[in-house]
Protein backbone atom coordinates (compact mmCIF):
# COMPACT_ATOMS: atom_id res chain seq x y z
CA UNK A 1 0.00 0.00 0.00
CA UNK A 2 2.20 2.75 -1.34
CA UNK A 3 -0.19 5.56 -0.34
CA UNK A 4 -1.03 3.91 3.01
CA UNK A 5 -4.56 3.29 1.81
CA UNK A 6 -6.19 -0.06 1.07
CA UNK A 7 -7.67 -0.11 -2.42
CA UNK A 8 -10.44 -2.57 -3.23
CA UNK A 9 -12.00 -2.98 -6.66
CA UNK A 10 -15.55 -4.38 -6.58
CA UNK A 11 -16.10 -5.93 -10.00
CA UNK A 12 -19.37 -7.30 -11.39
CA UNK A 13 -21.00 -8.26 -14.66
CA UNK A 14 -24.17 -6.63 -13.31
CA UNK A 15 -24.65 -3.50 -11.19
CA UNK A 16 -21.99 -4.39 -8.63
CA UNK A 17 -23.91 -3.58 -5.46
CA UNK A 18 -23.36 -7.04 -3.97
CA UNK A 19 -19.59 -6.96 -4.41
CA UNK A 20 -19.38 -3.41 -3.08
CA UNK A 21 -21.48 -4.19 0.00
CA UNK A 22 -19.34 -7.21 0.82
CA UNK A 23 -16.21 -5.09 0.42
CA UNK A 24 -17.59 -2.40 2.74
CA UNK A 25 -18.72 -4.94 5.35
CA UNK A 26 -15.28 -6.55 5.31
CA UNK A 27 -13.06 -3.47 5.55
CA UNK A 28 -15.11 -2.05 8.42
CA UNK A 29 -13.57 -4.77 10.55
CA UNK A 30 -10.15 -3.16 10.08
CA UNK A 31 -8.84 0.19 11.22
CA UNK A 32 -7.65 1.23 7.79
CA UNK A 33 -7.93 4.07 5.34
CA UNK A 34 -9.58 2.55 2.32
CA UNK A 35 -10.89 3.34 -1.10
CA UNK A 36 -13.50 1.10 -2.73
CA UNK A 37 -14.10 1.46 -6.46
CA UNK A 38 -17.02 -0.22 -8.19
CA UNK A 39 -16.75 -1.55 -11.76
CA UNK A 40 -20.18 -2.43 -13.19
CA UNK A 41 -21.27 -4.27 -16.35
CA UNK A 42 -17.92 -6.00 -16.86
CA UNK A 43 -18.71 -8.56 -19.55
CA UNK A 44 -15.60 -8.66 -21.78
CA UNK A 45 -12.04 -9.87 -21.35
CA UNK A 46 -10.71 -6.47 -22.50
CA UNK A 47 -12.51 -4.80 -19.59
CA UNK A 48 -11.09 -7.33 -17.16
CA UNK A 49 -7.54 -6.74 -18.42
CA UNK A 50 -7.84 -2.96 -17.96
CA UNK A 51 -9.21 -3.38 -14.43
CA UNK A 52 -6.38 -5.74 -13.47
CA UNK A 53 -3.80 -3.31 -14.87
CA UNK A 54 -5.34 -0.58 -12.68
CA UNK A 55 -5.23 -2.96 -9.74
CA UNK A 56 -1.51 -3.48 -10.33
CA UNK A 57 -0.94 0.30 -10.40
CA UNK A 58 -2.92 0.83 -7.18
CA UNK A 59 -1.84 -2.36 -5.41
CA UNK A 60 -5.55 -3.17 -5.11
CA UNK A 61 -7.48 -6.24 -4.06
CA UNK A 62 -10.19 -7.32 -6.48
CA UNK A 63 -13.40 -8.83 -5.19
CA UNK A 64 -15.80 -9.93 -7.87
CA UNK A 65 -19.26 -11.33 -8.50
CA UNK A 66 -18.93 -12.31 -12.13
CA UNK A 67 -21.45 -15.05 -12.83
CA UNK A 68 -20.30 -16.37 -16.20
CA UNK A 69 -17.72 -19.13 -15.54
CA UNK A 70 -15.53 -18.34 -18.58
CA UNK A 71 -15.07 -14.68 -17.69
CA UNK A 72 -14.66 -15.51 -14.01
CA UNK A 73 -11.85 -17.96 -14.82
CA UNK A 74 -10.21 -15.41 -17.13
CA UNK A 75 -10.19 -12.81 -14.36
CA UNK A 76 -8.82 -15.28 -11.84
CA UNK A 77 -6.03 -16.51 -14.13
CA UNK A 78 -5.04 -13.03 -15.34
CA UNK A 79 -4.95 -11.73 -11.76
CA UNK A 80 -2.77 -14.67 -10.68
CA UNK A 81 -0.31 -14.06 -13.52
CA UNK A 82 -0.05 -10.36 -12.59
CA UNK A 83 0.11 -11.15 -8.87
CA UNK A 84 -3.13 -9.37 -7.98
CA UNK A 85 -5.24 -10.77 -5.16
CA UNK A 86 -8.69 -11.59 -6.60
CA UNK A 87 -11.53 -13.07 -4.56
CA UNK A 88 -14.59 -14.66 -6.17
CA UNK A 89 -17.14 -14.15 -3.41
CA UNK A 90 -19.91 -16.20 -5.04
CA UNK A 91 -17.98 -19.33 -6.03
CA UNK A 92 -17.84 -21.00 -2.57
CA UNK A 93 -21.60 -20.66 -2.09
CA UNK A 94 -22.30 -21.82 -5.65
CA UNK A 95 -20.21 -24.92 -4.93
CA UNK A 96 -21.93 -25.56 -1.60
CA UNK A 97 -25.46 -25.25 -3.05
CA UNK A 98 -24.56 -27.43 -6.02
CA UNK A 99 -23.09 -30.09 -3.70
CA UNK A 100 -26.15 -29.99 -1.42
CA UNK A 101 -28.85 -30.00 -4.11
CA UNK A 102 -27.21 -31.65 -7.08
CA UNK A 103 -28.34 -28.73 -9.26
CA UNK A 104 -26.06 -26.56 -11.34
CA UNK A 105 -26.40 -22.76 -11.22
CA UNK A 106 -27.91 -21.17 -14.32
CA UNK A 107 -25.31 -18.38 -14.43
CA UNK A 108 -27.76 -15.59 -15.23
CA UNK A 109 -26.40 -12.10 -14.57
CA UNK A 110 -28.35 -9.31 -12.91
CA UNK A 111 -30.78 -11.40 -10.86
CA UNK A 112 -30.05 -9.50 -7.64
CA UNK A 113 -30.76 -6.17 -9.33
CA UNK A 114 -33.90 -7.67 -10.86
CA UNK A 115 -35.06 -8.73 -7.41
CA UNK A 116 -34.40 -5.19 -6.12
CA UNK A 117 -36.59 -3.82 -8.92
CA UNK A 118 -39.29 -6.34 -8.09
CA UNK A 119 -39.20 -5.37 -4.41
CA UNK A 120 -39.56 -1.70 -5.35
CA UNK A 121 -42.47 -2.49 -7.69
CA UNK A 122 -44.20 -4.53 -5.01
CA UNK A 123 -43.81 -1.76 -2.42
CA UNK A 124 -45.22 0.80 -4.87
CA UNK A 125 -48.20 -1.45 -5.62
CA UNK A 126 -48.87 -2.12 -1.93
CA UNK A 127 -48.65 1.58 -1.08
CA UNK A 128 -51.03 2.47 -3.92
CA UNK A 129 -53.49 -0.27 -2.96
CA UNK A 130 -53.59 0.76 0.70
CA UNK A 131 -54.17 4.38 -0.31
CA UNK A 132 -57.04 3.32 -2.62
CA UNK A 133 -58.79 0.89 -0.30
CA UNK A 134 -62.55 1.20 0.14
CA UNK A 135 -63.02 4.12 -2.23
CA UNK A 136 -60.24 6.39 -1.01
CA UNK A 137 -58.33 8.88 -3.20
CA UNK A 138 -60.52 8.72 -6.27
CA UNK A 139 -58.52 11.54 -7.86
CA UNK A 140 -55.78 9.02 -8.73
CA UNK A 141 -57.93 5.95 -9.35
CA UNK A 142 -57.01 6.19 -13.05
CA UNK A 143 -53.48 5.04 -12.16
CA UNK A 144 -54.75 1.60 -11.07
CA UNK A 145 -54.00 -1.59 -12.98
CA UNK A 146 -57.31 -3.01 -11.75
CA UNK A 147 -60.49 -1.80 -10.04
CA UNK A 148 -62.29 -4.21 -7.71
CA UNK A 149 -65.93 -3.57 -6.82
CA UNK A 150 -67.89 -5.58 -4.32
CA UNK A 151 -70.50 -5.76 -1.62
CA UNK A 152 -69.26 -5.46 1.96
CA UNK A 153 -67.74 -8.74 3.24
CA UNK A 154 -66.81 -10.06 -0.21
CA UNK A 155 -63.06 -9.92 0.55
CA UNK A 156 -62.30 -6.83 -1.53
CA UNK A 157 -59.41 -5.71 0.65
CA UNK A 158 -57.71 -9.12 1.14
CA UNK A 159 -57.96 -9.78 -2.60
CA UNK A 160 -56.58 -6.33 -3.41
CA UNK A 161 -53.62 -6.83 -1.06
CA UNK A 162 -52.91 -10.28 -2.51
CA UNK A 163 -52.73 -8.76 -5.99
CA UNK A 164 -50.64 -5.84 -4.72
CA UNK A 165 -48.08 -8.35 -3.46
CA UNK A 166 -47.74 -9.44 -7.09
CA UNK A 167 -46.96 -5.86 -8.07
CA UNK A 168 -50.48 -4.98 -9.29
CA UNK A 169 -51.89 -1.60 -8.30
CA UNK A 170 -55.49 -2.12 -7.19
CA UNK A 171 -58.23 0.32 -6.24
CA UNK A 172 -61.33 -1.13 -4.62
CA UNK A 173 -64.74 0.41 -4.06
CA UNK A 174 -67.68 -0.78 -1.94
CA UNK A 175 -71.10 -1.36 -3.51
CA UNK A 176 -73.66 0.09 -1.12
CA UNK A 177 -77.41 0.50 -1.49
CA UNK A 178 -78.56 3.93 -2.63
CA UNK A 179 -75.00 4.97 -3.44
CA UNK A 180 -74.03 6.08 -6.93
CA UNK A 181 -70.75 4.85 -8.41
CA UNK A 182 -68.44 7.88 -8.66
CA UNK A 183 -67.97 9.37 -12.09
CA UNK A 184 -64.19 8.90 -11.72
CA UNK A 185 -64.78 5.13 -11.89
CA UNK A 186 -67.54 5.25 -14.52
CA UNK A 187 -65.22 7.20 -16.84
CA UNK A 188 -62.69 4.35 -16.69
CA UNK A 189 -65.07 1.74 -18.13
CA UNK A 190 -63.25 -0.07 -20.93
CA UNK A 191 -59.95 1.61 -20.07
CA UNK A 192 -59.03 -0.20 -16.85
CA UNK A 193 -60.08 -3.80 -16.10
CA UNK A 194 -62.88 -3.99 -13.53
CA UNK A 195 -63.98 -6.92 -11.39
CA UNK A 196 -67.29 -7.23 -9.56
CA UNK A 197 -67.30 -9.58 -6.58
CA UNK A 198 -70.47 -11.39 -5.62
CA UNK A 199 -71.43 -14.04 -3.11
CA UNK A 200 -74.07 -16.73 -2.63
CA UNK A 201 -77.31 -15.23 -1.25
CA UNK A 202 -77.44 -17.65 1.71
CA UNK A 203 -73.87 -16.85 2.70
CA UNK A 204 -74.57 -13.14 2.41
CA UNK A 205 -77.70 -13.61 4.55
CA UNK A 206 -75.63 -15.21 7.32
CA UNK A 207 -73.07 -12.42 7.17
CA UNK A 208 -75.78 -9.78 7.41
CA UNK A 209 -77.49 -11.57 10.31
CA UNK A 210 -74.21 -11.64 12.20
CA UNK A 211 -73.77 -7.94 11.57
CA UNK A 212 -77.30 -7.17 12.79
CA UNK A 213 -76.67 -9.15 15.97
CA UNK A 214 -73.36 -7.40 16.61
CA UNK A 215 -75.30 -4.12 16.71
CA UNK A 216 -78.05 -5.79 18.79
CA UNK A 217 -80.59 -5.14 16.04
CA UNK A 218 -83.54 -7.47 15.40
CA UNK A 219 -82.73 -9.80 12.49
CA UNK A 220 -86.19 -10.12 10.99
CA UNK A 221 -85.69 -12.87 8.39
CA UNK A 222 -88.25 -11.64 5.86
CA UNK A 223 -87.01 -8.07 5.93
CA UNK A 224 -83.39 -9.17 5.82
CA UNK A 225 -84.06 -11.56 2.95
CA UNK A 226 -85.55 -8.73 0.91
CA UNK A 227 -82.65 -6.42 1.73
CA UNK A 228 -80.02 -8.99 0.73
CA UNK A 229 -81.80 -9.80 -2.55
CA UNK A 230 -82.01 -6.09 -3.30
CA UNK A 231 -78.30 -5.67 -2.48
CA UNK A 232 -77.34 -8.39 -4.95
CA UNK A 233 -79.65 -7.07 -7.68
CA UNK A 234 -78.18 -3.60 -7.27
CA UNK A 235 -74.63 -4.97 -7.47
CA UNK A 236 -75.37 -6.94 -10.64
CA UNK A 237 -76.89 -3.83 -12.27
CA UNK A 238 -73.74 -1.86 -11.53
CA UNK A 239 -71.46 -4.65 -12.76
CA UNK A 240 -73.40 -4.86 -16.02
CA UNK A 241 -73.23 -1.09 -16.49
CA UNK A 242 -69.45 -1.08 -15.98
CA UNK A 243 -68.88 -4.30 -17.96
CA UNK A 244 -67.18 -5.92 -14.97
CA UNK A 245 -65.87 -9.45 -14.87
CA UNK A 246 -68.21 -10.93 -12.24
CA UNK A 247 -66.65 -13.44 -9.85
CA UNK A 248 -68.49 -15.41 -7.16
CA UNK A 249 -66.19 -15.60 -4.12
CA UNK A 250 -68.41 -17.92 -2.06
CA UNK A 251 -66.22 -21.01 -2.37
CA UNK A 252 -62.94 -19.90 -3.95
CA UNK A 253 -60.04 -18.70 -1.83
CA UNK A 254 -58.21 -15.42 -2.43
CA UNK A 255 -55.37 -17.03 -4.41
CA UNK A 256 -57.78 -18.78 -6.80
CA UNK A 257 -59.74 -15.58 -7.40
CA UNK A 258 -56.46 -13.71 -7.94
CA UNK A 259 -55.30 -16.29 -10.49
CA UNK A 260 -58.60 -16.02 -12.36
CA UNK A 261 -58.26 -12.24 -12.55
CA UNK A 262 -54.61 -12.11 -13.62
CA UNK A 263 -55.12 -14.72 -16.34
CA UNK A 264 -58.34 -13.17 -17.64
CA UNK A 265 -56.92 -9.67 -17.98
CA UNK A 266 -53.25 -10.56 -18.55
CA UNK A 267 -52.33 -8.10 -15.82
CA UNK A 268 -48.73 -6.84 -15.55
CA UNK A 269 -47.28 -9.13 -12.87
CA UNK A 270 -44.18 -7.29 -11.68
CA UNK A 271 -43.10 -10.03 -9.30
CA UNK A 272 -41.70 -13.28 -10.63
CA UNK A 273 -39.97 -16.21 -9.02
CA UNK A 274 -36.85 -17.52 -10.70
CA UNK A 275 -36.01 -21.19 -10.29
CA UNK A 276 -32.36 -21.97 -9.61
From Swiss-Prot:
EC number(s) from the headed UniProt entry: 2.7.11.32, 2.7.4.27
Catalytic activities: N(tele)-phospho-L-histidyl/L-threonyl-[pyruvate, phosphate dikinase] + ADP = N(tele)-phospho-L-histidyl/O-phospho-L-threonyl-[pyruvate, phosphate dikinase] + AMP + H(+); N(tele)-phospho-L-histidyl/O-phospho-L-threonyl-[pyruvate, phosphate dikinase] + phosphate + H(+) = N(tele)-phospho-L-histidyl/L-threonyl-[pyruvate, phosphate dikinase] + diphosphate
GO molecular function: ADP binding; ATP binding; phosphotransferase activity, phosphate group as acceptor; protein serine/threonine kinase activity
Binding site for ADP: 150-157
Domain of life: Bacteria
Keywords tagged on the record: Kinase, Nucleotide-binding, Serine/threonine-protein kinase, Transferase
Name of a matching Pfam family: Kinase-PPPase
Family membership: Belongs to the pyruvate, phosphate/water dikinase regulatory protein family. PDRP subfamily.
Family matches, as PANTHER family: PYRUVATE, PHOSPHATE DIKINASE REGULATORY PROTEIN 1, CHLOROPLASTIC
Function: Bifunctional serine/threonine kinase and phosphorylase involved in the regulation of the pyruvate, phosphate dikinase (PPDK) by catalyzing its phosphorylation/dephosphorylation.
Protein name from the UniProt record: Putative pyruvate, phosphate dikinase regulatory protein 1
Record organism: Syntrophomonas wolfei subsp. wolfei (strain DSM 2245B / Goettingen)
Taxon lineage: Bacteria, Bacillati, Bacillota, Clostridia, Eubacteriales
